Amino acid sequence: MFRGANAISLDAKGRLAMPSRYRDELDSRSSGQLIVTIDAVDPCLCVYPLDEWEIIETKLRALPSLREENRRLQRLLIGNAVDLELDGSGRFLVPPRLREYAKLDKRAMLVGQLNKFQLWDEDAWNAVSAADLAAIQQPGAMPDELRDLIL
């Protein structure tokens, strides 16, 4: 399980180092193999261990292909998916096209989302986090099923 928001840096080649606290789990689950694709809702990237991505692919394959919405989602997620592998230093290269989509430059945030990570431009992450916090604090903004989760 991946938790927490981690400030990271991309080097001039577009490589970033996976925080060391996640490396052992990624190595044991998927031998350091990752899939990176766009997030279809937010302006960020999704980084999946290979075993989690295979579950997503199975679900996408099961969608009826005659529905345009399904084909659209498949095109976006699968068409932008890139196979990557952590190198000996725990780094991986984010391809230029995906860096451009998420507007990644030097400073980024790698955010654990339990089964995957989101990779954000740091400024975009800070803005979205502030907006999310403000929105959820509005009276009546939280659905009943979420209120039961709050400790």
From Swiss-Prot:
It holds the Pfam family MraZ. GO terms for cellular component: cytoplasm; nucleoid. SUPFAM superfamilies: AbrB/MazE/MraZ-like (SSF89447). One of its GO terms (biological process) is negative regulation of DNA-templated transcription initiation. GO terms for molecular function: DNA-binding transcription factor activity; transcription cis-regulatory region binding. It is found in: Cytoplasm, Nucleoid. Its main location: cytoplasm. The keyword NAD does not apply. InterPro entries: MraZ, MraZ_C, MraZ_dom, MraZ_N, MraZ_sf, SpoVT-AbrB_dom, SpoVT-AbrB_sf. CDD domains: MraZ_C, MraZ_N. Keywords: Cytoplasm, DNA-binding, Repeat, Transcription, Transcription regulation. Residues 5-52, 81-124 form the SpoVT-AbrB domain. Belongs to the MraZ family. NCBIfam families: division/cell wall cluster transcriptional repressor MraZ (TIGR00242). Forms oligomers. This is Transcriptional regulator MraZ. It comes from Pseudomonas fluorescens (strain Pf0-1).
